[in-house]
């Protein structure tokens, strides 16, 4: 497989860079197995039985990658969804602007696409959902990279001051945080149940087009619908033990509200 070092790239002229770019584009359209010759790969002291089983699994893994790409392509081709019901008003929860009003349309900044993740922290909760906290832990560290292409904001129903306090406790320093405590957004876009305290984890994507805002996509399957952006469960899938039989990732805190109204609800 052709590899390019950083030093090599720095010394390339425009013609060489064009050739390299063309080759890398071709590589991206070639199967992973074909380019890396996985059938010839062996690790120290492994058995033939292991290699045969790994080869069979590799085919399944490549099919999964191909399926993910196919689904993503279909998602990109969705027609515009419904126009935004109203230009909702939220309150910032980040340091330096806690409680200041911000309109939905302003969340886009200079981008045309907005990812808006609703996490479970209601106005009367003692602590937020441990699972949602796990997700936002990861979102905070990738926020800068994501926002080079799209706006990315996390919203909760708790008041801005409580969201800010929790963000400080978790060390969230990058991700944009807003409170929807005075807005009907979560109810309108199916991010909650019958009350403001019955919140749901939902990722929505909105798109600006011709001066208007349209809903593009939202998670609509099950509680595992955010698995693809959740490091914890995906990393556990790589281990021999697999995913632990637990409802939420391990945390050093508890949410009594969640345990009472969600996990132990009969």
Where are these regions (language model features)?
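Cationic, low-complexity basic patches in intrinsically disordered or flexible, solvent-exposed regions
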Residues: 3-4, 15-17
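N-terminal regions encompassing targeting/leader/pre-sequences
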Residues: 1-2, 9
């Amino acid at each position: 497989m052709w590899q390019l070092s950083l030093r090599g790239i720095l010394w390339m002229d425009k013609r060489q860079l064009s050739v390299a770019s063309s080759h890398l584009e071709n590589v991206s359209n070639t199967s992973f197995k074909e380019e890396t010759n996985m059938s010839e790969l062996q690790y120290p002291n492994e058995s033939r039985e292991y290699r045969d089983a790994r080869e069979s699994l590799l085919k399944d893994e490549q099919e999964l990658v191909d399926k993910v790409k196919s689904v993503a392509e279909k998602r990109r081709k969705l027609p515009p969804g419904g126009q935004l019901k109203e230009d909702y008003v939220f309150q910032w929860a980040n340091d330096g602007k806690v409680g200041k009003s911000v309109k939905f349309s302003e969340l886009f900044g200079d981008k045309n696409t907005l990812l808006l993740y609703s996490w479970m922290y209601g106005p009367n909760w003692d602590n937020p959902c441990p699972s949602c906290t796990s997700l936002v832990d990861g979102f905070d560290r990738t926020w800068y990279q994501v926002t080079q292409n799209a706006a990315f904001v996390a919203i909760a129903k708790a008041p801005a001051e409580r969201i800010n306090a929790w963000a400080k406790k978790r060390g969230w320093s990058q991700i944009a945080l807003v409170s929807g405590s005075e807005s009907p957004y979560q109810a309108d876009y199916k991010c909650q149940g019958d009350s403001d305290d019955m919140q749901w984890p939902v990722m929505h994507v909105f798109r600006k087009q011709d001066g208007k805002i349209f809903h593009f996509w939202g998670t609509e399957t099950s509680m595992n619908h955010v698995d693809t952006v959740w490091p914890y469960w995906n990393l556990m899938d790589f281990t021999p033990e697999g995913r632990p039989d637990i409802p939420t990732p391990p945390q050093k805190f508890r949410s009594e509200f969640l345990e009472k109204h969600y996990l132990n609800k009969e």
